[in-house]
Amino acid sequence: MSRKCELTGVGVLYGNNVSHSQRKTRRRFEPNLRSVKFTSDITAGEYRLSVNARCISSVEKAGGFDAYILKADDNVLSGNARAIKKKIIQTKTAKSL
């Protein structure tokens, strides 16, 4: 499993630990990933995604999982999230007809 948020694309960053004497050693800054179950109101399904902690509050602020994923850019979404977005769009258009 990659250390990457499925909704925002936030991944591992690299930098230095810097001691008091200014010695630098390489380190990794890993995102605070959580496995979260999101419920879609449109498809009435539950989807488990690996997202970072900031993304959880962003989803709530956007008005729910459906609103967030419909506004999200396809370039930052994972393959799994893109498939969920496609399913939500298809269900939404089928209900509107």
UniProtKB/Swiss-Prot annotation:
One example GO MF annotation: structural constituent of ribosome
Give the highest taxon in the source lineage: Bacteria
Q: Choose one Gene Ontology CC annotation of this protein and give it.
A: ribonucleoprotein complex
Q: Does the keyword RNA-binding apply?
A: no
What are the record keywords, sorted? Ribonucleoprotein, Ribosomal protein
Q: Does the keyword Ribonucleoprotein apply?
A: yes
Tell me the Pfam families matching this sequence.
Answer: Ribosomal_L28
Query: One of this protein's GO BP terms?
Result: translation
What PANTHER family does its record include?
Answer: 39S RIBOSOMAL PROTEIN L28, MITOCHONDRIAL (PTHR13528), LARGE RIBOSOMAL SUBUNIT PROTEIN BL28M (PTHR13528:SF2)
Instruction: Give the similarity note.
Output: Belongs to the bacterial ribosomal protein bL28 family.
- What name does UniProt use for this protein? Large ribosomal subunit protein bL28
Q: Which gene encodes it?
A: rpmB
